Amino acid sequence: MGGSFFYNGKKQERGIFMEYRVERDSMGEMKVPADVYWGAQTQRSYENFRIGSEKMPPELIRALGMLKKAAAMANYNLGKLDLRRRDLIIRVCDELEEGRLDGNFPLSVWQTGSGTQTNMNVNEVIANRGNRLAGESMLHPNDHVNMSQSSNDVFPSAMHLAAVMSMEDRLLPALSGLTGTLRRLEEENRGIVKTGRTHLQDATPIGFSQEISGWREMTEKGKSMIEASLPGLRELALGGTAVGTGLNTPR
């Protein structure tokens, strides 16, 4: 799978015997659970960095899948990737975006700042799932799925993409609903006067609608500031590769 040889066996982990396969890469052999699509690099990271229980957000994994799909299409258009491999990567990325491969991303969020482990986790899952669908070893995690990319441009791009989608799909609609509710409450409570408080003591009178208007204005300004951040978030680092020079990326 993913260009590695493998065979079946059993190993004991935390008192439980598990079926496994053995994958080999440039760093040696790794025993990987037989029923998952990740490979040697993911397994190595999983075993060496068991820090905390927090996993990568599913939104980020889906964003990485979208970027891998876009890269496959771009590499095909540039003559770097053949049609069959392009279509295979696209098919698996669609499965990933639909959440059908969610059980294949076990790594902690506590990892290198470049997100190399998770980038390789996604590469391995796409390659191994694609090879399973093809019935032969067609996709390599680095040579095909990660073609023209680096963790240093893909991971920050995925962060931007995940943030934009989360803002547009959930946060901004929720803020719009909250603003509407506050505006309604502001109108409903006109004429009601209450005691304002400062320093945990009664201070001066204030209209309840005036108080609510402050909450509404704060929410509206926050929403406007979030919307103003979107154009910058839509600028992606893709194409910069490892150190920003674009090395190994076709132009």
What are these regions (language model features)?
Residues 2-17:
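Short, Lys/Arg-enriched N-terminal segments with co-localized hydrophobic residues
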